[in-house]
Amino acid sequence: MAFAFPDSFRFADSHEYANADGELVRVGISAFAVDQLGDIVFVDLPDVGASLAKGTSFGSVESVKAVEDMYAPIAGEVVQRNEAVLASPEELQNDPHGEGWLLVLRPSDPAELDSLMTAEAYGAKVNAG
């Protein structure tokens, strides 16, 4: 199965995405990662106000197959978390690049987005294998 990713998204090697929206950045996990996990039963996210360092764990996603940590693709402060996904983890599974987003961050350094893979590069990586 080939996956398509929104052109505006940037991706970390660990399958999290960052999508800039003005001064804020929406963070989630890719459709590829969701597909690999299978049926998602629980999502754990940090509280609003938490400060995240790039590459550090910010929560976990539990499926019937595994529990996987999620890592911050950029550094920043959590300004919003998706309560709908916490209440109904299947939202993440149904629309990971849309309604299934996880966090909104105020980035510490917006230039960090440039260090992430483009949608094209990420797509080539995950679809190759």
Curated annotation (Swiss-Prot):
Residue intervals of the Lipoyl-binding domain: 24-106
Entry-linked InterPro entries: 2-oxoA_DH_lipoyl-BS, Biotin_lipoyl, GCV_H, GCV_H/Fam206, GCV_H_sub, Single_hybrid_motif
CC cofactor note: Binds 1 lipoyl cofactor covalently.
Protein name: Glycine cleavage system H protein
Gene: gcvH
Pfam families in the record: GCV_H
HAMAP family: GcvH
UniProt-listed CDD domains: GCS_H
Gene Ontology cellular component annotations, sorted alphabetically: cytosol; glycine cleavage complex
Membrane-traversing stretches: none
Keyword Protein biosynthesis appears in the UniProt entry: no
The protein's assembly and partners: The glycine cleavage system is composed of four proteins: P, T, L and H.
Biological process annotations from GO: glycine decarboxylation via glycine cleavage system
Known role: The glycine cleavage system catalyzes the degradation of glycine. The H protein shuttles the methylamine group of glycine from the P protein to the T protein.
Sites bearing N6-lipoyllysine, chain numbering: 65
Taxonomy of the source species: Bacteria, Bacillati, Cyanobacteriota, Cyanophyceae, Synechococcales
Organism: Synechococcus sp. (strain CC9605)
Names of required cofactors: (R)-lipoate
